[in-house]
Amino acid sequence: MNPSTTAMDIEEIRRYLPHRYPFLLIDRITEVEIGSHIKAIKNVTANEPFFQGHFPGKAVMLGVLVIEAMAQAAGILGVKSGRRELGLPDEPEEDGIYFFVGIDKARFRRTVVPGDQLHLDIKIIRSRRGIWSFTAEARVDGTLVCEAEIMCTTAGRGGR
């Protein structure tokens, strides 16, 4: 790994994302190269609360939650990259929140079920006027299960 590539454990992830159980959908960052890409993991367990109703007897992770997991990983990459771009320290703003603001070309290729390990791969396409665009892929056992282009933006002090 080069100096700008690092892994993050759950405690560091919590510093960058406001999400908490049951909506924190990233368990580990295996690689982040600021300004380029991020790789993350979500361990999908039978204990996830959304499996209680989706579907009884045939548990399937909701596709929108796979998208949300990708957006959370993109949020971390965007915050880290944006701060570096501005010459700021690599620390999240205490009251800054990164918002998921758009999605294009979303495709769901296969279901995600308990026991799967979701591998997320997010790459920056561009940033313009505070809006970041990313390509996002989710894989299970090397098989593509979801892909999309997502957009995020940050809200600093005061939530704007």
Where does each model-flagged region fall?
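RNA-interacting cores
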Residues: 5-9, 39-42, 59, 159
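Beta-strand-rich interaction surfaces with strong enrichment in secreted/lumenal proteins
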Residues: 14, 57-58, 108-110
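Flexible, low-complexity linker/boundary loops enriched in proline and small hydrophobic residues
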Residues: 2-30
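HotDog/MaoC-like acyl-thioester-processing domains
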Residues: 2-5, 18, 79, 111-116, ...
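Hydrophobic beta-strand-centered segment that forms part of the acyl-chain substrate-binding groove
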Residues: 3-7, 75-119, 145, 153
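Active-site- and interface-proximal helix/loop "cap" or "latch" segments in soluble metabolic
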Residues: 61-83
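Catalytic strand-loop segment that frames the active site of acyl-thioester-processing enzymes
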Residues: 19-61, 65-66
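Residues located in well-ordered beta-strands
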Residues: 25-28, 102, 107, 121-123, ...
